[in-house]
């Protein structure tokens, strides 16, 4: 587990997208025909559906963000509109690409992922991203955050396939820790309506070699990250690293998660962590 307080510094992880997606291509190539129909944590998706989603989203992002190709005009008036749009596009993409044979899908995935990695590596990390990270409450995000968000998407869906097929391999400090750090960036937004005395400190600790510590402090008008705190924390929430990604991506219900985490101090304050959902939909 990282000994540093996290949450403030940019996450530079463009180089990791290539590695994660190379592992995805290798994983898909290793599957037996029957394994493509195994159920994943996503209730409506089997392995082939998750693979189809990963192909759809990488092609969609290259088309829209890199190539500025928008074939459908949409009007977004609320966060609910964003969720509805994303859910519709995801469902449409899976419907199309789940029809592909594994060899065809894998070949397309390999080519698309190579282009995606090169694209993200070429971006100015501090320039404005085309799409903001909405689950963190942002209306404008820097490219580094959008790239980190992309890493969380690629990592957690691949992990769904690995869990379904009993093929571990990406829960390593170099690949998983940046994912956790990106997830945690949503904490100030999750706590935005939680009132507490100024100076109240919450500690989120993810245990295990891939984890870390995030200190969240109540300021006059908002919650914000701070460096390693000498102040006494009002609450410490400890989540095992094996569970954390599922908590933050709707991979486990809150009641089941609540039974597997440890909360020291103010329990009401700590349980709010379980409301962090680092995906759209």
Located regions from the model:
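An N-terminal domain-cap segment
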Residues: 2-49, 63
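Acidic/histidine-rich alpha-helical segments that form the ligand environment
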Residues: 84-127, 144-150, 200-202, 233-235
């Amino acid at each position: 587990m990282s000994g540093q307080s996290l949450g403030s510094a940019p996450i530079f992880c463009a180089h990791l997208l290539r590695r994660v997606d190379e592992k995805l291509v290798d994983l898909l190539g290793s599957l037996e025909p029957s394994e493509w129909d195994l159920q994943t944590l996503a209730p409506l998706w089997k392995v082939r559906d998750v693979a189809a989603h990963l192909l759809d989203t990488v092609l969609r992002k290259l088309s829209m963000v890199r190539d500025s190709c928008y074939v459908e005009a949409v009007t977004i008036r609320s966060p609910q509109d964003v969720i509805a749009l994303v859910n519709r596009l995801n469902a449409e993409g899976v419907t199309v690409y789940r029809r592909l044979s594994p060899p065809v899908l894998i070949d397309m995935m390999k080519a698309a992922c190579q282009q995606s990695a090169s694209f993200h590596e070429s971006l100015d990390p501090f320039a404005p991203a085309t799409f903001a990270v909405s689950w963190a409450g942002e209306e404008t995000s820097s490219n580094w955050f959008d790239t980190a968000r992309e890493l969380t998407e690629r990592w957690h869906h691949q992990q769904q396939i690995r869990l379904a097929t009993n093929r571990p391999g990406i829960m390593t400090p170099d690949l998983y820790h940046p994912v956790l750090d990106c997830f945690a960036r949503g904490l100030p937004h999750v706590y935005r309506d939680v009132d507490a005395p100024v100076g109240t400190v919450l500690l989120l600790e993810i245990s295990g070699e891939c984890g870390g510590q995030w200190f969240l402090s109540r300021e006059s008008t908002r919650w914000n990250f701070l460096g390693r705190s000498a102040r006494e924390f009002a609450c410490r929430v400890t989540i095992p690293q094996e569970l954390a990604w599922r908590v933050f991506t709707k991979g486990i219900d809150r009641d089941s998660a609540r039974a597997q985490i440890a909360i020291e101090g103010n329990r009401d304050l700590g349980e709010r962590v379980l409301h962090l959902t680092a995906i759209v939909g």
